Amino acid sequence: MTDADCCPFADCISQGLYLGDLRAMTSLAQAEAEEQAEWCVVTVLSERDLVGLSLPRHVDHHLVIRADDDLAVDLTPEFARAHAAIASALARGKSVLVHCMAGISRSATIAAAHLILERGIDAPAALAVLRRHRRCIGPNAAFRRQLKDLAEANAARAVPGVAEPQRGL
């Protein structure tokens, strides 16, 4: 079984990195244990959406971020943790599924943050990478601003002689 067979409701963003919706995660949860073991999952759902949800039991690692798709939600505190989980899984040769309910806003924000931190690109470039592979992405305005702030802070850290921004990103 290939990664695409196991995750039919996700789009491959780059080698081993998939962006999808809840159906992608539920498809993975129905896969055989040995197939699940080749995957790591980043779930971004509200507390309400998580109630009663059957999560994959045999994945290598599962990071659950509890967040609504709302303008008042700040995903910034989750960026470094999600990036570390994704980067670690990819370095170990695992496939990674990042998903939310629809695969449009929350999961796209987390995947874009990973690309910003991994590649040192700005927010529009990260979103363009995602959009090339998953045309329906559309982080809400607050999440887009958080990605812009992350990219600016990341760029400032990369420039010698520029004061390092506050920790927490």
Where are these regions (language model features)?
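Cysteine-based protein phosphatase catalytic domain of the PTP/DSP
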Residues: 2-96, 102, 116-155
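A eukaryotic "domain-to-IDR transition" signal
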Residues: 87, 107-109, 158-159
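Short, small-residue alpha-helix embedded
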Residues: 108-118
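Short linear loop/turn motifs
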Residues: 145, 163-164
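Intrinsically disordered, low-complexity regulatory segments in eukaryotic proteins
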Residues: 165-169
